[in-house]
Amino acid sequence: MKNTTTPKKRRKTILWILGICIVAMAMVVGVCNRKVNKCAEGRMYQNVSEIPYRRVGLVLGTTPKNAKGNPNLYYRYRMKAAAQLYHAGKVSYLIVSGDNHKREYNEPECMRQSLIALGVPDSVIYSDFAGFRTFDSMVRCKEVFGQDSVTVISQRWHNQRAVYIAQHKGLDAIAYNANDVDMKWWYVKSRTREMLAKVKVVLDVAFGKQPKFLGEPVAVGR
């Protein structure tokens, strides 16, 4: 039997299928982002004076310098926010959680030194060297560092994801929003990445994802 499908019809069919896939993916991204953002409502704070006291603050890690070797403003603002909370008496201890998968790359130690330079005593800072992802940092805060409640410290969009994870892992979390970075080109890039990260975290929670490492319990402030 002769195939009557023309190249034009095939292209049209392919475009329809691609269009449906794009719409479906956009819907998934939208639903997941609304779900995460909704979960964080009422738990985000901008002003030090308004945020309730929590014994422990969890500082989420990032690289101190960007790909060009320049200071990373996301990092700088997070350190400043964490120090503000400590000096205002809003937290008594800080867990600095980040990536240390290579000896020469140590986010927690960099954060510790930055906080000490901002006047935070070394004795109140605890390092989580296996905070490879936000998911790992939040779960380890409860399972390894023994916390039932915590103040998360990062930028607003990052905090939303962290609070969502906490709420689904039995950790009562509020968040203090560090200043964001006002660079339009970077804003678009980081927000696009964050939208996709929120989809991933919804799937991680739904499918019972576990951190890469747990380990022995660490007592904070004892």
What are these regions (language model features)?
Residues 34-191:
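A structural signal for short, hydrophobic/glycine-enriched beta-strand patches
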Residues 5-9, 13, 75, 158, ...:
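Short alpha-helical segments used as structural interaction elements across diverse proteins
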Residues 2-49:
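N-terminal type II signal-anchor transmembrane helix
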Residues 210-222:
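The feature marks non-catalytic terminal segments
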Residues 101-106, 174-177, 196-204, 219-222:
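A general structural signal for short secondary-structure boundary/capping elements
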Residues 188-213:
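A transmembrane-helix-recognition feature enriched in membrane-embedded lipid enzymes
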